[in-house]
Amino acid sequence: MNFIYHKWKYIIAAFLSTLLLIWGVNVISIENKHKYIPAPLLGQEVDFNQDIRPIFNKKCIACHGGVKQSGGFSLLFEEDALSVNESGERAIVPGSIRKSELINRINHTNPEFRMPSEGEPLDKKEIALLTKWINQGAKWKDHWAYIPPQPQQVPDISDPWIHNDIDKFIFAKLNKEKLLPNPKSDRYTLLRRVSLDLTGLPPTLEEMEAFLGDDSDLAFEKVVDSLLASPAFGERWAAMWMDMARYADSKGYEADRPRSIWKYRDWLITAFNDNLPFDQFITMQLAGDLLPNPSEEQLIATAFHRNTMNNDEGGTDNEEYRTVALIDRVNTTWSVLQGTTMECVQCHSHPYDPIRHENFYQSMAFFNQSADADIPSESPTLVDFEEEEDKQKLGRIKNWVADHPGKNDSVYYEKLIRITEPKLHPHYFEQMDKGLPVRGTATFKVTDSVYSFTKQVPLMGEDRLMLRYRADTSVGTLQIRLDSKDGKIIGSLPVNRKTKTEYNKEEKKDKIYTINETVSFLVEPAVGTRDIYLVLEGSAKAKTECVIEWVMFHHALPGQEASGFGGISTDFYDILNSTNEKITTPIMLDFSDGYRRKTNVFEKGSWMSHGDEVEPGVPAKWNPFTPTMESNRLGLAHWLTDPKNPLTARVTVNRFWEQLFGLGIVETMEDFGSQGFAPTHPELLDWLALQFVHDHKWDIKKLLKQLVMSATYQQSSHISDELNALDPRNYLLARGPRTRLTSEQVRDQALAVSGLLSPKMYGPSVMPEQPDGIWQVVYSGDKWKTSSGEDKYRRALY
């Protein structure tokens, strides 16, 4: 008993002593509030972005940021930092260091209580800055990149070296650093530099002789204008964009099967050569299909986000890999257009920047209504018919619909024929075998013991059902039923190995007699949201099954009573099942409202663990997503190209600057966040961004001409030992650029100077010569077939 008493006596005494020590230390540190503030800091205004945020990011954010919020305290968002944490205290109380727990903790001498709890403690200057910042009201500022570009006064400076306003910004900073820029490059070097930069190709001997022989003041400008007008210009800049669009002529993953998407590459070349304004360039790629009456070019542009990988391996979960593609689209959009690292937000709030976990899934909601899925056919695709026979059939069908008005116009039927857009993929169906679920993959089977169904299908009075199936023999009749497996039959299809659709004039209806597995047959029109069941009434054979790839409802062709309808009907089904040569390009299309998916937050980033449902939206620190913007990809495109967006123009001009100067004004081109590099010339960056949007009207060629006409670009790249020691990375731009050619440019240059380079543009991708064994895939069996003739010597982007 005495032992217990003495034990508690010492514990209580130690506890009271500790409390006194803590209270005493805190009182001392608070009473002498300027104790750690060096004299030079006492009078200065503390700047959050310059002085405070770097301390938080370096010493605090690992435990009190987007990934972890120890003690319920986060420094990522102002509202969180100033709120009450789990202890009931406020870590930061503006204007009061006495009430700010943060000041107590960073001054504490006891390691158990001092913050940061791990690593080196804050030094005296850091403590002084935090103390003074809170004393001055703890004024929080948004990171510079999230504030829209601000109008800048061009430096009032003159010098014979200066060519345009860009040079005034550069010269002013050099002047401040007591440096002088280099003189102009020699004409040979300058021509080679600008030719490689603007077209990716070296100048020809004729171009070199013409430039060297032109002594006029406009000689260089004439060269620049000629290069901007060259077809090679579009090829050079399309190659740059293809890297950001993750372009490939194959699908990726283990099989890495071929993909026909070269029409998107050709669209890029044309867009750059035609100088499509950048805001339209972005809008068409993100949402060309959602524009009013989209053109073929606008549809092909959407292949930007069909460059995601596709897993053709058997046994994979289609929804899982569809989700992987969605995540890739979110990350690519934010990286390419906003210079923002979004990948980590899939699992948690951003570690350093004001982007919450749910913001990732709000972004994903913009893309979640797309009709594509992880299936081998890569539908939806845009079909281009190569054979004149098929083109004529399509023309006759369009003319027929125009001459016989019905529920839908010719655009509807052209889309039905040219765009493989099945609404109901296998993964929308559930299969039941004797009351037990059967897991589907890329296709699903309907047998005499299995039925399949999908719920909540919006029907709008369509009177035909189209589906694609495979059957090895005559297997019975496929019934389409409403609401249950024993529900009302609205249509039926005899499933045969080989059939063909023909129009029976006497019965005024189609016979089912289709070849090549795509069939369309009459169904009783229904309206509303219904459950659809596919039930096979099989034959007596032991193996009775029909493998279905997709299902869709549509409206019949108009004018069934008119003379000649039989021929048009035959044309319609012939072209749907044509085996003639055709080109298919994967494109983006959204489901109609009735098929819309819900989007949920993935808990810890797992696609199988759904949290709260979210609607399309953007992070709060960016420009607002206004009510006039549609809650789809088109609305996202309008938000990104809104002049109020703080990043789109900055990121874009920075990217083009980097291509010419070798280093961006912001060196971390894909990270404009607080962990990225600050701009070397922030005023110039904002000035260029505002010029690009308001003065140039998003004109890429005008921007590039402005850059290459500057003395900054044209100066010699010679570097002295002194300058190399002072500025080895050329941040100050006291010399001209020294940039490496890309591997593709090295190859193109070698072919060009040897006289072998083919000027042929556009068309399917080619396979130039390469050593045996380089191109190998695991199990697809695809072979590298070396192209012949001039196709072996085309530019690398082909």
Protein language model regions, located:
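Non-catalytic accessory/assembly modules
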Residues: 259-283, 302-305, 311, 331-342, ...
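Glycine- and acidic
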Residues: 115-116, 223, 227, 250, ...
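Extracytoplasmic
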Residues: 395-578
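Extended surface/linker regions that mediate inter-domain or inter-protein docking
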Residues: 12-17, 22-26, 219-356, 363-364, ...
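N-terminal Sec-pathway targeting helices
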Residues: 2-15
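Primarily short, surface-exposed interaction patches in extracytoplasmic proteins
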Residues: 158-193, 197-232, 246-292, 353-354, ...
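C-terminal capping alpha-helices of c-type cytochrome domains
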Residues: 48, 118-140, 378-410, 538-540
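Solvent-exposed helix-loop boundary motif
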Residues: 7-8, 25-131, 138-166, 171-172, ...
